[in-house]
Structures are given as C-alpha cells and as structure tokens.
UniProtKB/Swiss-Prot annotation:
<feature type="region of interest" description="Disordered">
    <location>
        <begin position="194"/>
        <end position="217"/>
    </location>
</feature>
<feature type="signal peptide">
    <location>
        <begin position="1"/>
        <end position="27"/>
    </location>
</feature>
<dbReference type="Pfam" id="PF11938">
    <property type="entry name" value="DUF3456"/>
</dbReference>
<feature type="disulfide bond">
    <location>
        <begin position="30"/>
        <end position="173"/>
    </location>
</feature>
<keyword id="KW-1015">Disulfide bond</keyword>
<dbReference type="GO" id="GO:0005102">
    <property type="term" value="F:signaling receptor binding"/>
</dbReference>
<feature type="disulfide bond">
    <location>
        <begin position="27"/>
        <end position="185"/>
    </location>
</feature>
<protein>
    <recommendedName>
        <fullName>Protein canopy 4</fullName>
    </recommendedName>
</protein>
<keyword id="KW-0964">Secreted</keyword>
<dbReference type="GO" id="GO:0005576">
    <property type="term" value="C:extracellular region"/>
</dbReference>
<keyword id="KW-0732">Signal</keyword>
<dbReference type="InterPro" id="IPR021852">
    <property type="entry name" value="DUF3456"/>
</dbReference>
<comment type="similarity">
    <text>Belongs to the canopy family.</text>
</comment>
<feature type="compositionally biased region" description="Basic and acidic residues">
    <location>
        <begin position="205"/>
        <end position="217"/>
    </location>
</feature>
<feature type="disulfide bond">
    <location>
        <begin position="83"/>
        <end position="145"/>
    </location>
</feature>
Length: 217
C-alpha cells in the first residue's frame, strides 16, 4: 500500500508540476503555430476551385479569375482562428522540451483515469469533469500564438505569395521570428516513447529541414 501511495504521489507531481515555471517559450509557440497553419493549408492545397475577383461593370468587363489554391482567400481562411486549434493540445509531462505539447491524452492522465475507473479516489484539485479542459500552459500557448500571428502576419503573407519553395517553419521561425532567439526546439521530433531528437538525416524535409505532421504532435 505504501508503494502504491508513493506511485500516486509521483503521478500527481507530474500533473501538478509548477506551471508558472514551465510556461511555453517563443520557440515552442512558433513551432506549433507553423505546424497548425501548414496543416490547414495542406487540406485545401489541391483544390481546383476558381475564385472570381472584382465587380462586373456596365462596360461588360469580366471579373478576374484566379485559382483558389494560390488566392489570398485560401490564406485568410487558413489563418482564421488558427490559434484556437492550439486548445486541442494537451501537456504530456512525461515528454521533454516542446514534445510535451501534443494532441491526445497524455500517458500520465490515462493512468490516472484508469485508476478512477477502478474505483481509486484520485484528487487533482479540480473536478474530474474538468480534467480534459485546457491547462494554464495550453491557454498561454494560445495567447502567445495570437500575439505572434498578429505581430508577424506580413511574414506569413510574404512566405505564402513569394517563398513557398521554402518550408514555412524555416522561413517564418528560423529566418524571422526566432532569428535572434533560441531555436533548439525546432530540432525536436517525437520518436515514440523515447522522445529523442531525431538525427539530421532522419528529420530532414525536402528543404533540408525537419518537418512536422500535426497528427504526430
């Protein structure tokens, strides 16, 4: 029984770790912002829709037609409420660095929920029905995401219209937002339970930099 109590205390300490000391940093925010924005754009990248621009004048001049997948409308729709998607992330306290932010329930929380289902009384300081609500860390991720996007919206637009040959993370984070800041988190890639940084060869994308799939985070 004593060992079981110690185990529970350890699990609680992972969940209730001092969140003020582990709020997301600029690199982590930038990384997740680009992951979500790229994912939103990828979902509409193959659209064959055509967008008509301008008004039909009395002169009979026709409205200009452009492809949706290269239009400003596509970018605007992708960016709309993009930071709301950050609220889908959970804190995986058992993972290192930026990998602690991922979608899906963490191993720690799964363990605690299984204990509850077995009739074990678990106290986390919040009602059970609120366990899946966004944490302080995730709420801060969203807030910083909104601020970052507002301050660097022109950089996103520049990439979209002129530099899509470069990866979004590389152009937005490395070359601009984090140009004079720590970029270590950009090299972190989830490799199963190990949570190790991928090697340079394994993590390279088409532009020579690591790519991230929103579904993997």
């Amino acid at each position: 029984m004593e060992m079981f109590t110690v185990f529970l205390f350890y699990m609680f300490s992972l969940v209730l770790a001092n969140q003020e000391e582990r709020l997301p940093n600029k690199c982590e925010v930038c990384k997740l912002l680009t992951v979500e924005l790229q994912d939103a754009l990828d979902k509409t990248g193959r659209s064959k829709e055509v967008v008509e621009l301008g008004e039909v004048l009395d002169t009979g001049k026709r409205r200009r037609k452009i492809k949706y997948n290269t239009s400003e409308m596509r970018l605007t729709e992708a960016m709309d409420n993009i930071c709301e998607r950050i609220l889908q992330y959970k804190v995986h306290a058992e993972r290192p660095g930026s990998l602690r932010y991922a979608k899906g329930t963490s191993q720690t929380m799964n363990t605690l929920k299984n204990l509850v289902e077995k009739g074990v009384k678990v106290e986390l300081g919040v009602p059970y029905e609120l366990w899946d609500e966004p944490t302080v860390e995730v709420a801060e991720l969203k807030r910083q995401c909104e601020t970052m996007l507002e301050e660097h919206e022109e950089v996103v637009e520049d990439w979209y219209f002129h530099h899509q040959d470069k990866g979004l993370e590389r152009f937005f984070c490395e070359a601009h937002v984090l140009k004079d800041s720590d970029q270590e988190c950009l090299t972190e890639i989830w490799k199963g339970d190990m949570g190790m940084k991928g090697s340079e060869e394994e993590s390279e994308g088409k532009d020579g930099k690591e790519t991230h799939d929103a579904g993997e985070l």
